[in-house]
Amino acid sequence: IGALTGFTPFKVEADDEPLCHFVESNADTPFFKKMLYTNEIDGIVSHFGQYRNGFLFVMLPPEGGTLELWLSEDKQVVNFKGNYNLRLLRFACWIAYGVATAPFKTVAIHTSTIVCQSKAILFLGESGTGKSTHTRLWRENIQGSVLLNDDSPILRIIDGEPWIYGSPWSGKTPCYKNESYPLAACVRLSQAPFNKI
């Protein structure tokens, strides 16, 4: 994990018991009991589902060599096995983090996020809609606007209030900030088939 860019700002001293342990495993990968989700991004086919004792995630890149991870039912142990290509490992860590932190009212969101007047604003939309372009325009035209994360910030509910955190997963823009802000707004972007102001 130390080879993955973006994680250094989030490193903490090991004073407390960690939320979960990442373990390189030599055990046999469990079998899916129930498939929950399958998708393909950039030729990488991913499967997510349940096995007998928890959750299983498998990535199959076009060049071969799968990366498999499975989380125990209590989500305290994340087992990794297979192809440790950094691109695969980064995404697998994102999945593991999401599953392990879900019980703590935490979720990663696909969005580009700015901070303006000490509050976070999320710009949501399908890939290619213009989320990053929109946050860039805010930074260029609205004084005090700064980028918090350009791909996958973390939303967490604390005492009934939504907070947004920077994360190690910021897409193509290297913006890894260990900061948090209250949520001011969520803006859903859609793209028209024409240009008009």
Question: Would you name each region that the model predicts?
Answer:
Residues 134:
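Hydrophobic positions on the alpha1 helix immediately C-terminal to the Walker A/P-loop
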Residues 131:
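Conserved lysine of the Walker
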